[in-house]
Amino acid sequence: MSSSQTLVVKLGTSVLTGGSRRLDQSHIVELVRQCAKQHEKGHRIIIVTSGAIAAGREYLNYPDLPATIASKQLLAAVGQSALIQVWKQLFAIYGIHIGQMLLTRADIEDRERFLNARDTLHALLDNKIIPVINENDAVATAEIKVGDNDNLSALAAILGGADKLLLLTDIEGLYTADPRSNPDAKLIPEVFDINDELRQMAGDSVSGLGTGGMATKLQAATVAGRAGIDVVIAAGVKPDVISKVIDNEPVGTLFHGLKSPLETRKRWIFGAPVAGVIIVDNGAEKAIKEQGSSLLPKGIKEIKGDFSRGCVIRIQSLQGKDLAHGVAHYNSDALRLIAGHHSQEISQILGYEYGSVAVHRDDMIVS
């Protein structure tokens, strides 16, 4: 068995409906079987599901509604609960729990909400619960919509620290031309660089129910790839497609992620304005420099400046030496209260807890 992987599986409307106007229950059963099989092997599966509007239409027996945003949001509100019930009932067959997360762009772009969403996602995964993510279409406006579930799945992959992102659709992958209209179209098995030529090859969605086409899948592959995540575009009807991706078998089109995503992250953390300084004791200094450890509240001696959770801060020694840059897991007021205390005391002192660390080692670049 391959070592444990985190895989985001994005299921488009065309995959969930089979191109029809209703959910294809038999195909969803098969996709759940594949996900459950990998979950039982120890892999961490995150599902990004489309289909809420299609499910709402079916549930309400195809009402004749005007093509307005309000009508779509009505269908999404009704359909989302119906859709999540389908996932819940099917995974329950395998004794697997799911957890629903509804996101908007604001949850991603606001750093504090980003951290909250990330913590929730990791908590679900750590407790062997499969997250089922969708955009919150019932309330999202154009200003706060991610816009399509392809890009949402890329953001979910980054939130979840995924190894791979699988975009399941109604064609085999990226072709040199539209295979539905051009018999000479050839499948492109591997992509190392997404350039303008590739973008010109991308066609448009034809299902009518979805919001994403090949162009949005290339956008998603670009976003995830910059974070070092491999992306596969493949046909949802391909037998055992999820297992094949986990096992690195050739299927669809593989977009290779950057091999050194840490460099991108390092540039972001070092490039971000420093909002404050955390002074640490000698023990914390040694743990950070020699062991690459997270910074615990116990090792904090002083907080300089006022900053929010999610801001980039500088970590310094008692002698004023720069030790690291990192992302604060608590705001400055909270850190002042818990400084010098054991992590077990955080919830007692603050009345809430965002975890046991002040700055996580994954969010820290040692100087």
From Swiss-Prot:
Entries under Pfam families matching the protein: AA_kinase (PF00696), PUA (PF01472)
SUPFAM superfamilies, per the entry: Carbamate kinase-like (SSF53633), PUA domain-like (SSF88697)
Annotated ranges, domain PUA: 275-353
CDD domains per record: AAK_G5K_ProB (cd04242), PUA_G5K (cd21157)
Catalysed reaction, written as an equation: L-glutamate + ATP = L-glutamyl 5-phosphate + ADP
GO molecular function: ATP binding; glutamate 5-kinase activity; RNA binding
One cellular component term from this protein's GO annotations in UniProt: cytosol
Broad enzyme group: transferase
GO biological process: L-proline biosynthetic process
Origin: domain of life: Bacteria
Pathway(s) annotated for this protein in UniProt: Amino-acid biosynthesis; L-proline biosynthesis; L-glutamate 5-semialdehyde from L-glutamate: step 1/2
Keywords: Amino-acid biosynthesis, ATP-binding, Cytoplasm, Kinase, Nucleotide-binding, Proline biosynthesis, Transferase
Subcellular location: Cytoplasm
Coiled coil: none
EC number of this enzyme: 2.7.2.11
Binding residues for substrate: S50, D137, N149
Keyword Membrane listed: no
Binding site for ATP: K10, T169, D170, T211, G212, G213, M214, A215, T216, K217
Record NCBIfam families: proB
Protein family per UniProt: Belongs to the glutamate 5-kinase family.
Task of the protein: Catalyzes the transfer of a phosphate group to glutamate to form L-glutamate 5-phosphate.
Protein name, as recorded: Glutamate 5-kinase
Species annotation: Proteus mirabilis (strain HI4320)
Gene coding for it: proB
